[in-house]
Amino acid sequence: MKEKGSSFSGSIGFVLAAAGSAVGVGNIWRFPYLCAKDGGGLFLLVYLVLVLTFGFVLLTTDVALGRKTKKNALRAFESLNPKWKFLGHLTFLVPALIMTYYSVIGGWIAKYFFTYIISDGKDAASDGYFTSFITSDIAPVVFMMIFLALTAWIVFRGVEKGIEKFSRIIMPGLILLIVIIAIFSLTLSHTDTDGTVRTGMQGLAVYLKPDFHGLTVKRFLEILLDAMSQLFFSLSVSMGIMITYGSYVKNEVNLNKATNQIEIFDTGVAFLAGMMIIPAVFVFLGKDGMASGPSLIFISLPKVFDAMGVFGRPVAIAFFLMMGFAALTSCVSVMETLVANCMELYHKPRKKMCGAVGIYSLVTAVLICLGYNKLYFELKLPNGSVGQLLDVMDYISNSFLMPFISLLTSILIGWVIGPDWIIGEVERNGEHFKRAGLYRFMIRYVVPVVMLILFLVSTGFADLIS
């Protein structure tokens, strides 16, 4: 069932909510690492080209599909072609899997924010602090529950009064915090015991200057795949979120303009995240100090904050507050997608479905927390990495399902339904879709090929073939 009046009030509300979904912890803990690893400005250039081509195609497809059908992913694909009903069910699985662990990560962020509020944070910078926390029995569950309760409360309030209102308040604050921390990072300097001086501006050069040293065709393809995977996960596509948010967009909204603004917003935040983190890590830990994922946020950066001296604690508080905003906006979008799909599937009101999804999220998140102690195991994944329960959920959703869903969606839109179906929705109010020709070419030929390659690489099939 679709709620009466379940829609964003206008274009701004939609853009801020969608950008909030796209701007998650992945933008902040993965984008800077890939920049440092993949040639700085070279990676930035490749990423920007992909945003303007590949990114806009996937984003436009999801949003237009949602608005045209006024349905969530579970029913939207079925309304296009009953034979493709299964694609809606596959898409529904992605947020269902992501929801199992996203509130756990949100709880980690809440814990570090609380630590810096009540202390100078020196414990957080010590070796083994993060491992000790996530392997404990009670603390991770408590902080996860706090984060999950806040997420559920926002979703419970509905689209306009909950998600849109929250996004209008939080997103400007998130951007302001990122800009302030980024500017501060550029002013930093540090002298090692051997007299070597490193500055934030030198770190900025590491970030922006293209590094072509040792570049080969194989190396460029690796950079291309890294940029593609980052873009793919950054824009919240192929997980039903943008289809759901698209179904809340009013018909009079200029869809082309709105999706362009989301692209700019998401790319801008990713760029600022790199400017915020790379110079700071470079100053205190050197060029080889960059890490990815939880290691960057919860191990490397606390050491950087500790090395800042008197400025470390306020910067850490601002940083983890900003991280909390980013995690919360993304988690809200994941939970809203589950709630909206369940409302449509079971024909129950928001309050009941929010309660049901909340219970599901709590139970599964507790299991993820226990995956670091009582239920700990190590499993070698098909892509060669080794992980435990959280990593398995992340792998299935991000590395397996999302590329596969994008591949199938491009085939459905490009060859079964036809690109003009999406283009017609974008031009619903007489707007000119300037990139219509590019969209046709990309959705038919480029997206299927690239998504197939990404799927084969991320699932390990490429290594088996070679």
PLM segments and residue spans:
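Transmembrane helix-boundary motif of multi-pass solute transporters/channels
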Residues: 10-48, 241, 257-260, 264-267
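Membrane-embedded translocation segments of transport machinery
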Residues: 2-8, 168-328, 332, 352-353, ...
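Hydrophobic alpha-helical segments of multi-pass membrane transport proteins
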Residues: 327-333, 354-368, 372, 391-425
